[in-house]
A protein has these predicted regions:
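Long, low-complexity, Lys/Arg-enriched
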Residues: 1-80, 87-132
């Protein structure tokens, strides 16, 4: 579901939940700027709920399609991604992004109720570490 539709920001927060729910306060821990927000959450949240390649591919297509629609609609320059899912699905999703055609993506690491740091996917070395 899309939130903050009237926002004038060129930043998009993408919250993907397949294992645990991502709470608003956790999203707020990565930025104090009002951003566009899109949430993807399965009806049933469980660890390793994505059972096969077809399910993973279907979910990835839905997510990437909606992200790209919003990127185009609002001229998004940076995607801030928070994910509560299996490592396997997280990497599978990441492989679907294009460094040529998609905007900058920062993926955040969750620890004890907050997303405390992130990795900017278009930077190298220590320049890639983002502390919100």
């Amino acid at each position: 579901q899309e939130e903050n539709k009237s926002c004038k920001s060129n930043n998009l927060i993408v919250a993907i939940s397949t294992s645990l729910e991502i709470k608003n306060i956790e999203i707020a821990s990565i930025t104090d700027t009002k951003c566009h927000i899109i949430r993807f959450q399965l009806q049933t949240l469980e660890f390793d709920i994505i059972g096969n390649y077809a399910q993973a591919e279907n979910l990835r297509k839905q997510i990437l399609s909606k992200i790209r629609e919003i990127v185009k609609k609002y001229d998004i320059q940076c995607i801030h991604m928070v994910i509560s899912s299996s490592v396997a699905f997280t990497f599978f999703l990441g492989a679907g992004f294009s460094s040529q055609h998609d905007p900058n993506v920062i993926v955040y690491h969750y620890d004890n109720g907050k997303y405390i740091w992130g990795i900017d996917m278009k930077r190298n070395g220590s320049d890639a570490v983002i502390i919100p």
